[in-house]
Amino acid sequence: MAVVAIAFVFFLSAMVLSVHAAVVEHTFIVSQVNMTHLCKETPVIVVNGQLPGPAIEVTEGDSVVVHVINKSPYNMTIHWHGVKQQLNCWADGVPMVTQLPILPNHNFTYQFVVSEQEGTLWWHAHVPLYRATVHGVLIIRARQGVPLFPKPHKEVPIIIGEWWGIQLAYADTTSDYNSASTINGKLGDLYNCSGAMEEGYMMDVEPGKTYLLRIVNAALLSEYYLKIAGHKFTVVAADANYVSPYTTDIIAIAPGQTVDALVVANAAPGRYYMVAMPNQPPKPDFQSPVLPTRGIMQYSNTEGRSLSSDVPMSPEMPDNHDTMVSFYFHGNLTSLHPRHLLVPERLDERMFITLGLGSVCKHDRLSCKRGDGSNESTILATMNNVSFHLPPVSTSLLEAYYNNPSNVDWLQELPDMPPQVFDFTDHSLIPTGPKAERLEPTSKAALARRFRYGDVVEVVFQSTSLMQSDSNPMHLHGHDMFVLAQGQGNYDMEKDVARYNLVNPPVVNTVLVPRLGWVAVRFVADNPGIWYMHCHYEFHLTMGMVALFIVEHGPTVNTSLPSRLLDLIGTANDHFLMHGQKNGIERTLGCAVI
């Protein structure tokens, strides 16, 4: 323990001595509180008693120290979404992959440096479903250099989320949905309790001033369209990477993504609705409730009259089934990066990954009807027709790997291609029909893919009808990805490679794979460790749409993962974060299936 303490003191001393850098320290107390919405009191897990949780604000190069005190009845970890954690995979916050979970009545300290990143990221729980209420914004400001857009009058975090009127520990992934959508934790006046409207988010503005909206989609289930009546956005960054300024009246943002957008208060003084509406594929895809929310952008009183009685102007929203709005929004983004990142031209690894749903037989049955949601089978989410399943382990995979890379040789390799090539976007497979039953049966495994340090990796994600035509926001921990191209239908290497943007593609940590379409990304495996790659739709994640990307140590000390400074206080035999399997849906808890 003395060695750990000395190491920690040395770590802090080194941070303080860094030129101009600061140590930003927070304490997160995770607890269960009761909140009342829609005439119902619900137990909710939150940080420091608030929803959303506290904002973390840093300057590029600063060090962050967060003490997590878990007073909730559930195990917990915190993931710093989009923070690259260079040479610091230990702080990534994935239970049983990078650390043991933080047990109730136990503590853990995260420490990391935010380097070579600027913009908006966020933090959230990385245990199933609880990121719905355990989340907050992480703001990174530039330390030096010429600003790439005018300095705003004010910065405003806008966190789009969901309100669940049930205890998330008991959510049924086949039939339970959120009760409302939220902006900064508020449901808004589209919802009421016995006729009394729910409180909505209010954004006060001054005429002529410019505001920087730091937008986060913290929702579990849906991509959202965001509009403000009578105003336009100028998008300047996505996932903490600058983009060429893009003017639009609507923002499409998928779960896990962040967008920085400027808004000028240049309309007539008054009140204007800010609407966040979830989108979803049209029928025959399964239809979930459409639950938009709205806040109000209100001009300050400049003429001596009250504006509170003004009827807010409403924006004209697209059809919630019009997913092409999202396709065009993401397709219009190009990078504008001060560090002049170059897209690597050489390729060391190329993968084609299909995203779908499948099923396995229950109770060790040798055969059952594929796609059957009855008691015969369990529905899974898959990558190349394999669903992630990690058996019980006694320590984190990262610790086992660090001690000896051969300790994780039992992990099954994620294949380069699906086991069977077919018309991936065949509409007759929505929902799973007779054709799907003739495809390769789904399997379960602890999926991983190893990369040498410095490998350039290209991945094409292909959406399939077996996903019931859902889009999929795919998030890679520890790395950013160049988004080279996206398209509708099936990917065709001979034709589609010619469409790649190798000059100024957007750079993201979470890329949306369009419904019944594909997206091609490229990244450099230059951060040693074991990194999660997964869908950020929560139910797809818990059902197994996960793989581990293992980046091997480089040839030098500066390209190899160092040892961790602090051990997690907890017991390895209590690594299951929740208990139960409901209605044929199997839930993968980050790394353990129960």
Residue map of PLM features:
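Histidine- and aromatic-enriched segments that form or immediately flank copper-ligand environments
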Residues: 24-149, 222-251, 271-289, 362-524, ...
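Cleavable N-terminal signal peptides of Sec/SRP-targeted secreted and luminal proteins
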Residues: 2-21
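Extended recognition/assembly regions associated with phosphoester-bond processing machinery
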Residues: 261-264, 449, 459, 516, ...
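Conserved small-residue hotspots that stabilize compact domain segments
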Residues: 207, 229-236, 243-246, 250-304, ...
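Extracytoplasmic/periplasmic copper-protein system
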Residues: 18-20, 134-160, 286-319, 544-594
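Eukaryotic intrinsically disordered, low-complexity regulatory regions
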Residues: 177-190, 204-210, 216, 305-366, ...
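Acidic-aromatic/histidine active-site loop/patch
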Residues: 154-220, 317, 349, 356-358, ...
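Terminal regions of secretory-pathway proteins
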Residues: 334, 344, 412, 494, ...
